């Protein structure tokens, strides 16, 4: 799968990112940021990429640099219409390759998001812990990590 483009997000991308996040918000398996102002703040704290297919933003991927050896993958969101097509796998492949020198990559995932958990496990992530109310939304999260 090479027909997707990863582009560093800019403020003009925020409405399209929010549209995808709003589609995902009702799933109950993710923490979606559905306000444009929250996304602009997130872009100041994280490195955010948009996922583009056929000229359309279909998702986003974000990470925070904790240190030169530690990255926190703060989000990987794919529009439900484009899920189960290998796009998440392609994005994760590119990021893991790009972050080759990083010793530790952390991710959080909702326990009901079995597709994401399976994907991360296939990439060598391990389940480290369970956190109740992780984002303050009343929902638990699983913390997964990959040490390279």
Regions found by a protein language model. Give the residues of each.
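Conserved glycine-rich acetyl-CoA-binding loop
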Residues: 56, 79-93, 102, 110-118, ...
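Conserved beta-strand-loop-alpha-helix junction that forms the acyl-donor binding cleft
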Residues: 107-117, 133-138
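Acetyl-CoA-dependent GNAT
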Residues: 8-14, 18-81, 92-94, 98
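Short hydrophobic/aromatic beta-strand or adjacent loop that forms the aromatic wall/cage
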Residues: 46, 139-143
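Short, well-ordered beta-strand micro-motif
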Residues: 50-52, 143-147
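Conserved N-terminal entry element of GNAT/NAT acetyltransferase domains
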Residues: 1-12, 148
